[in-house]
From Swiss-Prot:
Keyword Cytoplasm: no
Originating organism: Homo sapiens (Human)
Chain positions of TPR repeats: 143-176, 216-248, 249-282, 284-316, 317-350, 352-384, 386-418
Disulfide-bond pairs as recorded: none
The organism's place on the tree of life at top rank: Eukaryota
Gene name of the record: TTC13
Record protein name field: Tetratricopeptide repeat protein 13
C-alpha cells in the first residue's frame, strides 16, 4: 500500500501492458506491504484493515470489502496505514527498497506515470535476489533470481503471470518452498471473493506449513486468508501458533483485532495491551485498546486511550471520531462536538464522522444542523442508508414532509440482497413513512379531534412497537401527501407574542430539570421544550379539573381521567421525535395483549456493561441475595448458614451464578428473581414488578437483564390501583383549591408521586414512559402550588428509583429529597393556555423548531 501522495507506476512484462488498475499499484509498497507474508508478515490483512470503527458492523463491512481484494492502491486511506505503522518497520528485516519511484508522503504526486519495462523488472528482481530479500530464499543464485522475478510480478499486479512463473519452477522442483509460498500469495492477491482463489491460497500455505512448520509468518499469512472468509477461530489459532513461535507487537495486535470482531473484548484488550508493551508507539493499537473499553461501557477508560493515541499521532482522524462518540455516550455534547470538529478539520469529507456528528446533533435536538451533516454525507456517499434515513427523519420531525418522505422512499427501494440481513434503517423506514403520511394529513386538525392509538391499525402498531419486519396482512397504506396541506414553515421566536415567548422560556427551563445526568443520556433541547410544555399543559388541565371544568378529548367533552393527564405528555413526546413509537400497550390488538409485551433491558450482556444502570447494580445484587436467602430459608433451612456465608463473599452480580449452581442443582445455566409491588388499595396484596434474569456458563459470558411483562391481567390490576389513587387525588385537589393547609398540599404531593410510582412499575407505553411520567409529576405538583426546583441527581434514573423502591412511600421520600419543592411563582397563573396556543400538530412543530436561546437566556 502506497503512502498518501505517492505516485503509481505501470509495468511491461513479456510485451504485455498491465491494465490501468495495475498501473496504480506501486511496486515498492506492494513488496513492502503485500508481500509481507514473507517479507513483513501480517501486512496483507492487518495493515490493510481500516481502523476499527465504534460499531462492529462497520468493521466487518470494511473487512469484507477490503481484505478479500488484497490489492494495493494509492488511496489516502492506505497511506494512513503506511504512516501509522512506520514505527514497526524494525520488526522485520525483510525487503526495503530505497530506489523507489514514489515521492515521500506529503509531497506532490509524480508528474507522469512511468512504465516498468522488462529490463527494469529484471533489475529490481536481481537486486532483491542478491540481497535475498524475499521469503524462503535458497542457496542457488539462479533459482533466487527466478523467484525474485515472480515476486516482482506480484508487486506489479500481474498475478496470473506470477502464478505461471511459480508453477513452471515447481514442475522442476515440486518442494520449492518459496515458489509454493509465492503462488499462495498470488492466489490470495487475485481476490478472495472468488472461493477458488481462497481455497488454492490456503492449500499452498498449508503445504508450506507442512514443509516449514516453524515459520510464524506463514501461520500469520494463512490467518490473513482465513479471517476475511469468516473463519475467525481458525485464524486465531494460526496467530496463536505464530505468537508461540515468535511473539511480536503486530501479531498480538492482529489477534486482538480478531478477538474484537468476535466480541471478546476482554481478551482483545489483553492482546492490544501486550502489543503496546512490546511496542508502545502504536497509535492504532492504542485506538483498538480504547475501543475494547468503549464496547464494554467503560467510557472514561476509553477516552483516556483515545487521548493517548492522539498523543502518538496528532492527525489521527479515527481517534478523534472515536473520542467524539465516547463523549457523546457520556452525554458531554460540547466535548463530543469539539472532537468531531477536529476530525473534520483533518478531513472535511470523512463520511463516518459526518454521520456520527449528524446523529448526535439530531438527538441533541439541533435538527437543522444535523440535516446539514446528513446532506453532506450523502453528497459523498449517495447510497449511505443511515444518512438517507436520518435525513428523512430530520425533515419529518421539522414538518418538511415532502422532502422527508422522498428520502424515506429511497431507503425503501434499497432492498437487501437474497441472504443479506436487512439494516435497522430498512426495517424502520416503512413504519416511519406511514406515520409521516398520517401526521401530514392531520397537521391542521385540532389535536382534540383525533387519536393516534385508535386511528393507526392494530397490527401496524404491534409490529412497529416490536421493531418487526413490515409484513402486515391486508394492510391499507395511509393516503399520500395532499397538495393542499403545506409543509410546516419556520417560525421566528420574535413572531410570537411576548406572553407566548415567556411560556416557551419557562418550558425550556422546566424541561431541563428532567434531564438525566447519567452516561448514555445526551441533553436534548427539543425534548426539554416539548416536555416542559407538557408539564405546563398538565398543570393547567389538572387545575381546570380541580375546579370542576371538563376537558375535550377525541371530539367529546368530559371529566379528565388519569390517562388524559398522561396523554398530554404522550402527544408532546411523540412529536418531539417521530422515530420512536410512543404507544399505549393496552390499545394493542387483543392477540398481542394476551401474549404480553416485554420491556427488556440488558444490564450486562457478555462483556458489555450498560453504564446507564450501573448505579443500580449493587441495589439489585442486595435484592437478589435477600431473595436467595428467603428461598433457602423455606426450602433448605439446614444449609442456610452455608449459603449466607457464600453470599457474603459475592460483590458482583456475575459471581452469583457459580454460587447458585453450587447450592441449587436446578439452576443449570441461570435463574430468575421476581420483584413485587405492594398495593395501597388492598393492604397485603402484591403485584408483579419486574423480572431479574441471570444466565450464562461462566463469568464474562453472562446475560444480566431486567424485564417488565405487560400482560392484560397485570395491566388491569395496575389500572385499578391508579384509578383509586387518581380518584383520591382529584378529591383532595378540589379541597386544596379551596384551602391553604400545608397538610393538604403534602397529601396531594404524596398521591401524585404514588400514582406515578405505579405507572413506572406498569410501564404501559412502548417508549418514553420515564420522561412522560416525570413531566406529569412536575405538572401536577405545579397544579398543587409546588414547583420542582431541583435537578435529578447524577446517576439517578427516576423510573429505576420507582422500580427498585420497596413501596410508594419509599419512592415518594427519595423523589422529594432531590426535587427541592418550593411555592410556585404567581407568574405561572398568567401564562397563556398551552392547549389553546398550540392547538394543532402544525403549531406544536413550529414551536419545537423555533430558536429561543438568545431571548430565553436574557429572561433567565
Amino acid at each position: 500500500m502506497a503512502p498518501a501522495g505517492c505516485c503509481c507506476c505501470c509495468c511491461f512484462w513479456g510485451g504485455a501492458v498491465a491494465a490501468a488498475g495495475a498501473a496504480r499499484r506501486v511496486l515498492l509498497l506492494l513488496l513492502l506491504g503485500v508481500l509481507s507474508a514473507g517479507l513483513r508478515p501480517g501486512a496483507l490483512a492487518t495493515e490493510h484493515y481500516s481502523p476499527l470503527s465504534l460499531l462492529k458492523q462497520e468493521l466487518q463491512h470494511r473487512q469484507q470489502q477490503e481484505a478479500p481484494a488484497g490489492g494495493g492502491g494509492c488511496s489516502p486511506q492506505s497511506g494512513d496505514w503506511g504512516d501509522q505503522y512506520s514505527a514497526e518497520c524494525g520488526e522485520s528485516s525483510f525487503l526495503n527498497f530505497h530506489d523507489s519511484d514514489c515521492e515521500p508522503k506529503g509531497s506532490s504526486p509524480c508528474d507522469s506515470l512511468l512504465s516498468l519495462n522488462t529490463e527494469k523488472i529484471l533489475s529490481q528482481a536481481k537486486s532483491i535476489a542478491e540481497q535475498k530479500r524475499f521469503p524462503f530464499a535458497t542457496d542457488n543464485d539462479s533459482t533466487n533470481e527466478e523467484l525474485a522475478i515472480a515476486y516482482v510480478l506480484i508487486g506489479s499486479g500481474l498475478y496470473d503471470e506470477a502464478i505461471r512463473h511459480f508453477s513452471t519452477m515447481l514442475q522442476e522442483e515440486p518442494d520449492l518452498v518459496s515458489a509454493i509460498y509465492g503462488r499462495g500469495i498470488a492466489y490470495g492477491k487475485k481476490g478472495l471473493h472468488d472461493i477458488k482463489n481462497a481455497e488454492l491460497a490456503l492449500f499452498e500455505l498449508s503445504r508450506v506449513i507442512t514443509l516449514e512448520p516453524d515459520r510464524p509468518e506463514v501461520f500469520e499469512q494463512r490467518a490473513e486468508i482465513l479471517s476475511p472468509l469468516g473463519r475467525i477461530n481458525e485464524a486465531v489459532n494460526d496467530l496463536t501458533k505464530a505468537i508461540q513461535l515468535q511473539p511480536s507487537a503486530r501479531l498480538y495486535r492482529h489477534r486482538g483485532t480478531l478477538y474484537f470482531i468476535s466480541e471478546d473484548y476482554a481478551t482483545a484488550h489483553e492482546d492490544f495491551q501486550q502489543s503496546l508493551e512490546l511496542n508502545k508507539n502504536q497509535p492504532i493499537a492504542m485506538l483498538y485498546k480504547g475501543l475494547t473499553f468503549f464496547h464494554r461501557g467503560l467510557l472514561k477508560e476509553a477516552i483516556e486511550s483515545f487521548k493517548e493515541a492522539l498523543k502518538q499521532k496528532v492527525d489521527f482522524i479515527d481517534a478523534y471520531k472515536s473520542l467524539g462518540q465516547a463523549y457523546r455516550e457520556l452525554g458531554n455534547f460540547e466535548a463530543a462536538t469539539e472532537s468531531f470538529q477536529k476530525a473534520l478539520l483533518l478531513n472535511q469529507n470523512h463520511v463516518q464522522t459526518l454521520q456520527l456528528r449528524g446523529m448526535m446533533l439530531y438527538h441533541h435536538g439541533s435538527l437543522q444542523e444535523a440535516l446539514k451533516n446528513f446532506k453532506r454525507c450523502l453528497q459523498l456517499e449517495p447510497y449511505n442508508e443511515v444518512c438517507q434515513y436520518m435525513k428523512g427523519l430530520s425533515h419529518v420531525a421539522m414538518g418538511q414532509f415532502y422532502e422527508g418522505i422522498k428520502a424515506q422512499t429511497k431507503v425503501m427501494l434499497n432492498d437487501p440482497l437474497p441472504g443479506q440481513k436487512a439494516s435497522p434503517e430498512y426495517l424502520k423506514v416503512k413504519y416511519l413513512r406511514e406515520y409521516s403520511r398520517y401526521l401530514h394529513a392531520h397537521l391542521d386538525t385540532p389535536l382534540t379531534e383525533y387519536n393516534i392509538d385508535v386511528d393507526l391499525p392494530g397490527s401496524f402498531k404491534d409490529h412497529w412497537a416490536k421493531n418487526l419486519p413490515f409484513l402486515i396482512e391486508d394492510y391499507e397504506e395511509q393516503p399520500g401527501l395532499q397538495p393542499h396541506i403545506k409543509d410546516v414553515l419556520h417560525q421566528n421566536f420574535e413572531s410570537y407574542k411576548p406572553e407566548v415567548q415567556e411560556l416557551i422560556c419557562v418550558a425550556d427551563r422546566l424541561g431541563s430539570l428532567m434531564q438525566y445526568e447519567t452516561p448514555g443520556f445526551l441533553p436534548n433541547k427539543r425534548i426539554h421544550r416539548a416536555m416542559g410544555l407538557a408539564a405546563l399543559e398538565v398543570m393547567q388541565a389538572v387545575q381546570r379539573t380541580w375546579t370542576n371544568s371538563k376537558v375535550r378529548m377525541n371530539g367529546k367533552t368530559r371529566l379528565m381521567q388519569w390517562r388524559d393527564m398522561f396523554d398530554i405528555a404522550v402527544k408532546w413526546r411523540r412529536i418531539a421525535d417521530p422515530d420512536q413509537p410512543v404507544l399505549w400497550l393496552d390499545q394493542m390488538p387483543a392477540r398481542s395483549l394476551s401474549r404480553g409485551f416485554n420491556n427488556h433491558i440488558n444490564l450486562i450482556r457478555g462483556q458489555v456493561i450498560n453504564m446507564r444502570y450501573l448505579e443500580y447494580f449493587e441495589k439489585i445484587l442486595h435484592f437478589i441475595k435477600d431473595r436467595i436467602l428467603v428461598y433457602h430459608g423455606a426450602n433448605n433451612p439446614k444449609g442456610l448458614l452455608e449459603v449466607r456465608e457464600a453470599l457474603e463473599k459475592v460483590h458482583k452480580v456475575e459471581d452469583l451464578l457459580p454460587i447458585m449452581k453450587q447450592f441449587n442443582t436446578k439452576t443449570k445455566d441461570g435463574f430468575t428473581v421476581n420483584t413485587k409491588v405492594p398495593s395501597l388499595k388492598d393492604q397485603g396484596k402484591e403485584y408483579d414488578g419486574f423480572t431479574i434474569t441471570i444466565t450464562g456458563d461462566k463469568v464474562g459470558n453472562i446475560l444480566f437483564s431486567v424485564e417488565t411483562q405487560t400482560t392484560e391481567e397485570r395491566t388491569q390490576l395496575y389500572h385499578a390501583e391508579i384509578d383509586a389513587l387518581y380518584k383520591d387525588l382529584t378529591a383532595k385537589g378540589k379541597v386544596l383549591i379551596l384551602s391553604s393547609e400545608f397538610g393538604e398540599a403534602d397529601a396531594v404531593c404524596n398521591l401524585i408521586l404514588s400514582l406515578v410510582y405505579y405507572f413506572y412499575n406498569l410501564m404501559p407505553l412502548s417508549r418514553g414512559s420515564s420522561v412522560i411520567a416525570y413531566s406529569v409529576i412536575v405538572g401536577a405538583l405545579m397544579a398543587s402550588g409546588k414547583e420542582v426546583a431541583g435537578k435529578i441527581p447524577k446517576g439517578k434514573l427516576v423510573d429505576f428509583e420507582a422500580m427498585t423502591a420497596p413501596g410508594s412511600e419509599a419512592f415518594s421520600k427519595v423523589a422529594k429529597s432531590w426535587m427541592n419543592l418550593k411555592s410556585i411563582s404567581p407568574s405561572y397563573k398568567t401564562l397563556p393556555s398551552v392547549s389553546e396556543t398550540f392547538p394543532t400538530l402544525r403549531s406544536m412543530i413550529e414551536v419545537l423548531n423555533t430558536d429561543s436561546s438568545p431571548r430565553c437566556l436574557k429572561k433567565l
